[in-house]
Amino acid sequence: GFVVTAEELASGVSIGDMAPYPHQFNTANELLALCAAQGKSIAEIKRENELSRRSAAVLDRGLTKIWDVMNDCINRGLERGGILPGGLNVKRRAKPIHEALMAERGLNMSAPHTINDWMSVYAMAVNEENAAGGQVVTAPTNGAAGVVPATLRYWLDHVPGATPKRIPEFLLTAAAIGGLIKFNASISGAECGCQAEVGSASAMAAAGLCAVLGGSPAQVENAAEIALEHHLGMTCDPVKGLVQVPCIERNGLGCIKAVSAASL
């Protein structure tokens, strides 16, 4: 299904009644063929499809808002301590981990593998906020909400040459991949396990990162495939049904896999 507003429901217009998108694709192969035939990136194809439904100003404001909500969620999660609700007595760990990372940075003592800790702490911050009832962006779900923002924040904060001007490219690319997965398979953990949630999120993040690192459409698709492939078989078995254990840490590992997939 799709989320619709009250106004959309009242209008009585269904998705099937809308004019077709200018660039129609149902598979990654079809998307890559469009990119090759038109000499465009995945983000450009996705953007032109979106512009058939809304103005450039509305689209750009929407993309900006999505990242603002994602980034604000990271920042809140990095600042809040305490115990998560639900009865498992899970401690919020993003805040102390972030404080330790900042202290190491100030002393110029960081080990090379510390970059993995940065990726993890960004993702954990989001999923601790989710577990506490905070506002997140479903990318593609609440339980996997930390992977895409953590990967984008990692790129912005830690990769030389990264610029906020390319955030829309990252998000549009990730959205194209997420749409393909939802159309052809599932993004529901209850239906297909965590491979459908964190696996899909990792694929989306890998694609977005590969795109802003200069990857071709084929490389972007391959990055998404690698990230998804290495989540296959992952089940959805949260302790006591709460989206905490193993979900919070799993998002951190999903981010690390996304970055590795983009590099490969």
Which stretches of residues belong to each language-model region?
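Hydrophobic alpha-helical bundle architecture
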Residues: 162, 173, 179-251, 264
